[in-house]
């Protein structure tokens, strides 16, 4: 997902495109079709050099989920996580 399309998706949801929001969406796009936990999203952002905290990732994922931009698959245990809503 290009940075421009990520920014469009965020603006369509009424959100300002921040480094954390853009990073979370790009990580979820690159992991598709696999779901990622919040910790896995944080690890991927850390490896990419994106300066965000675990708390920020948790807040961003919760906000994006509430607005329908990402979806929590609701499964328990392994395989539980967040997916980019198509």
Give the ranges of each region predicted by the language model:
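A short acidic, leucine-rich amphipathic alpha-helix
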Residues: 40-42, 46
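Short, hydrophobic-biased segments on the C-terminal half of alpha helices
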Residues: 58-62
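Flexible coil/turn residues that form the inter-helical turn or adjacent wing/linker of helix-turn-helix
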Residues: 34, 50
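A short, conserved structural fragment
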Residues: 65-74
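Short, cationic-aromatic polyanion-contact patches
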Residues: 75-86
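Intrinsically disordered, low-complexity serine/threonine- and proline-rich regulatory segments
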Residues: 1-31
